[in-house]
Amino acid sequence: TGDRDGGDSPGYGVWRSTDGGISWHARNSGMGNRTVYEVLMDPTNSNILIASTNGSRIYRSTDAGASWTYTSTASSCKDIAFHPTDSNIIYASGTSVNRSTNNGVSFTQINSGTPTGVQRIALAVSPDEPNWVYLIAGDGSGLDGIYRSTNSGANFSTRTTTPNVLGYDTTGGTGSQAWYDLVIAADPTDANVIYTGGVNLWKSVDGGATMTCTSYWVSPQGGIDVVHADQHALEFSLHTNAIYNGNDGGVYTSSDNGVNWDDLSSGLAIAQIYKIGVSQTVSDLAINGYQDNGTSVSRGTSFITEIGGDGMECAIDPTDANYMYGALYYGDIRRSTNNGASFSAINGNISEEGGWVTPYKLDPNNANRMVAGFDNIWINNNSSILTHFLKISNKTFVRNIHD
């Protein structure tokens, strides 16, 4: 339980269901209410479980989770994996790479050829080459490298350091969110085929020596399919040639080796709403801002996404519903004058960056007046002029504005 990616959800240890997920019971004796990043079951003994948790800890259970023993400290460990044919060998990675050769009783850090000074390392194995281990490492500036071991993790060598497969562009570019979105997977039938995920998805057919972008987070581009940004999970089906991807937008799958991707998220009630703006003049009209899934206009039972990215503060003019307001992160406020058909930025003259969720309010008695909170309080007394904000405070760093 908990959220391993953003660290926003508290954890309550490991829970277990014995009736196919209908009911759940805590199994965290000896572990407590920790955020659990990953739980693995020994493929040869279902009573043995290995869990990575917050606090850089690895726990082991020999009684199907009834009790847990703290076995090792592994720096910011998030990923763990069993050797495909030898369950005595377990790999763990976070900001370092660690290995157990005694079924998780203890772990030793591997320093030969492994990355150092990075924000995060993810790992992958494949039964096609059971002694191979892949690593992908990155920091805030981009990809550190893709690495491979061919001797069960005893040492690693660099496969590539370019392009920046953690960047925002289909060519790599700059930047990275390795602390947040980082994943790697190796094909179970061909260990030379690997997929990596950061903002976009990338693929290699030569063991990571060369990488090709296989999805783009904005829109289809040059034969590259669109997949929602921020990749967190990649899993291969053992029964078909499908690969499944979990990201900030939901679940996607590809059945043609990553060329095309289908969104499977329909029906999943997973949207996290930051803010809602409700019309005072039109029944069932609202505008909603979602974490990771943009801003949508709701008319009764239909929801139409109008602004991408992360949707934040929302509002509708109290006297004229043609005027709607949405926002992206850090204070990028947008306005529609045509009932949500299109939006334009309105805060071009504000010289400050706002908070992640930047607050703003419309005056209920004068819909032409908007107050917005950045480092200072800014006011626009004539919303028909898009860049007519005036600063009216001195370094207050506003987080909330109340009517």
What annotation goes with each model-predicted range?
Residues T1-D403:
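Beta-propeller blade termini and top-face loops
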